[in-house]
Amino acid sequence: MIRSVVRGFGAALPKRVMTNKEMESKVDTSDEWIVQRTGIRQRYIAGDGETTASLGEAAARAALERAGLTPDDIDLIIVATSTPDNTFPATAVNIQNRLGMRHGAAFDMQAVCSGFVYAVTTGDAYIRGGLATRVLVIGAETFSRILDWTDRTTCVLFGDGAGAIVLEAQEGAGTKADRGVLTAQLRSDGAHGDKLYVDGGPSTTGTVGHLRMEGREVFKHAVGMITDVIEAAFEATGTTADDIDWLVPHQANRRIIEGSAKKLGIPLEKVVVTVDLHGNTSAASIPLALDAAATDGRIKRGDLVMLEAMGGGFTWGSVLLRW
């Protein structure tokens, strides 16, 4: 049985760090208020010359280097982003060009904060279907450029960055002991589209628009949706929360992260948390967290890792993989 195994990983962050203290000078807020409600202490903000594509390229190159591969070895690039450099062409095609690739395919996926989970699921499907041997999956965002910097309820939450993994086809035994993606569960419900959205677009306002969010409504749904889709992954693979070595959640808010882990019975010692350093980087948050935990040695070969995310739409999903 063919499995999609993580062969390499990488990350990239903008040069500029914006602390909560600096945020105090922009809007009516405080470090104490932000930390207490979100767990965020700082975030990275893209500067001149730093774009979604440039950050994505840097993360991709880091992942390729760690995998011992070159762009020539990649068959497909999937970029999860809600903040593309252009309406078209796709950011993935831009990154393909930056990497010097003249073969294969490249496209973007947009599922907001769930984007990386959706992209990994799609890359896994290409590999299992025999359409690709190696897939470069990137989550890259510059959310700072769609924020309303006068809205203290949203501008304090988000940051910029990119992360990437290389998925490679490897033969497995077809058991839960295999390395690679074991199952993926995706969900969406468009009835909640007005809870987290951008108030602009090419066919409506002709503007980029700004992010708008009903935070309490998002929080109200988040824990239940996340735990349901993780439990679906357990059922599909015959695993339980006790089998999980690491939960790598979308880094939206520490309260959501802790609430989901508690409901699932996963101790916080097994949860990778980077929201304090990065803020909410949407589709980039999971690969950034993976990179941090794999680089410092927490996530090791053979570990059972659960990825989960929820984003605007609503969209949500989980991927269970063995590292």
From Swiss-Prot:
Pathway: Lipid metabolism; fatty acid biosynthesis. GO terms for biological process: fatty acid biosynthetic process. Gene3D superfamilies: 3.40.47.10. The keyword Coiled coil does not apply. It is an enzyme of class 2 (transferase). It catalyses: malonyl-[ACP] + acetyl-CoA + H(+) = 3-oxobutanoyl-[ACP] + CO2 + CoA. Keywords: Acyltransferase, Cytoplasm, Fatty acid biosynthesis, Fatty acid metabolism, Lipid biosynthesis, Lipid metabolism, Multifunctional enzyme, Transferase. SUPFAM superfamilies: Thiolase-like (SSF53901). Its main location: cytoplasm. One of its GO terms (cellular component) is cytoplasm. It comes from the Bacteria. InterPro entries: ACP_syn_III_C (IPR013747), ACP_syn_III_N (IPR013751), FabH (IPR004655), Thiolase-like (IPR016039). Its EC number is 2.3.1.180. The active site is at C113, H250, N280. Residues 251-255 are annotated as: ACP-binding. It is found in: Cytoplasm. GO terms for molecular function: 3-oxoacyl-[acyl-carrier-protein] synthase activity; beta-ketoacyl-acyl-carrier-protein synthase III activity. The last Arg residue of the ACP-binding site is essential for the weak association between ACP/AcpP and FabH. HAMAP family: FabH. Belongs to the thiolase-like superfamily. FabH family. Catalyzes the condensation reaction of fatty acid synthesis by the addition to an acyl acceptor of two carbons from malonyl-ACP. Catalyzes the first condensation reaction which initiates fatty acid synthesis and may therefore play a role in governing the total rate of fatty acid production. Possesses both acetoacetyl-ACP synthase and acetyl transacylase activities. Its substrate specificity determines the biosynthesis of branched-chain and/or straight-chain of fatty acids. Homodimer. This is Beta-ketoacyl-[acyl-carrier-protein] synthase III. It comes from Sinorhizobium medicae (strain WSM419). The lineage of its organism: Bacteria, Pseudomonadati, Pseudomonadota, Alphaproteobacteria, Hyphomicrobiales.
